[in-house]
Amino acid sequence: FSCTGGTVAENQRVTLTIDRSQITGKAAGQFAVVNEHIQEGTGAANIIVEVDNTPVSYPKGTFVEANGCIAMEAQHYTAKWDVPGGGFALLKPYGRLGTALKVFPATANFENSEERPYLEYTFAAAKDGNYHVQFHMSATTPVTFEPKQYIGYSVNGGAVQVVNTVHEENRPFFGSEQWYAEGFANVKLTEAIILCHAGVNTLRFYAVSPAIILEKIVLWPDGTTLPESYLGPRESYSC
């Protein structure tokens, strides 16, 4: 710890430095913060920092779960597959994070195609089980008056799941509550549940409908909740 004791009047940053050569497996350290101006026994907080130094070997580009989630920016894929009808291209600067991926030509539609462009991401899950996957996309609208704008995804080589990003399929998207909400927040969010295994997994994001622009993907274990924030969690560490 950069500071092991003292009194703070306004604020002070404490830096924790870890020598991983001295740690085998898992370890934890803690320090206490006490408010001296209120009744004894109240106003204290114990801060616990856990470290996992278990030896692992992941392929290059693998995102590692930490702090209860995995966050991957769209540009940091491990594989990209284009087809004769179109392919993903980088947009920069663009969106809330500065970069995004979009299929060109802009009117390319793969709804009825056997081959679709995709981006592949590699991540390491901490445990077996269900995970939430949340796709962060730009706040675009369908290119037709039909209330549909599809994306596709698959996990670990499984079947492609096609999802409509439009929530209400019985009314026009333009002017709907979702249209207004996405415009104000400047993001389109679509979420699903996927089955992962402990260790390395692969996730593919498929282009289906036109005008879909991917900015980020976030995963977290089922049964847990992400802290609320405007941009979502920062991008995770990758090997």
Question: PLM features: residue spans?
Answer:
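Extracytoplasmic
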Residues: 1-239
